[in-house]
């Protein structure tokens, strides 16, 4: 029973770290990244679909994204979706291709982004701690139902704390990498 709680705790904490990593890819750094446009949706035959389902997005160089659009009539819709996004990007259209030059971030903007990254990291740490609390409550419930002994509970709580420490360190590592990426010129 305690093994199930430990496995569930570990998988939920791993998902928290993966969610943090996914959220951080949406934060614009000075470097081009195809995931920057992942959240942009365009109208495609009456339905809203992710940009990646209407075009190929590639990194041309460290500051340029290239979008190859599959259908000519989608060019204007995709261009409009990029302009209307919260990324502040200006697309340059050439036939069925759109090129996006990413302007370098100002020092002030970089510092703002670092604050956002730290906030995202803190939210992930809170999620991990909440998962730890839930697991410890499950162990307490098993103890009151006499399904485990106090020694098993204590040993499992120590194991949960080790798992928590591991994932908090993992979050710190992800945050440091993103902050370093943001502060690079």
Curated annotation (Swiss-Prot):
GO CC list: cytosol
GO BP terms in the entry: cytoplasmic translational termination
Cell location: Cytoplasm
UniProt cross-references to InterPro entries, sorted A to Z: Ribosome_recyc_fac (IPR002661), Ribosome_recyc_fac_dom (IPR023584), RRF_sf (IPR036191)
Pfam families recorded: RRF
Primary location class: cytoplasm
Record keywords, A-Z: Cytoplasm, Protein biosynthesis
One Gene Ontology term of the molecular function aspect: ribosomal large subunit binding
TM helices/strands, residue ranges: none
SUPFAM superfamilies: Ribosome recycling factor, RRF (SSF55194)
Keyword Coiled coil (UniProt): no
HAMAP family in UniProt: RRF
Function: Responsible for the release of ribosomes from messenger RNA at the termination of protein biosynthesis. May increase the efficiency of translation by recycling ribosomes from one round of translation to another.
Family: Belongs to the RRF family.
Name of this protein: Ribosome-recycling factor
Organism: Dichelobacter nodosus (strain VCS1703A)
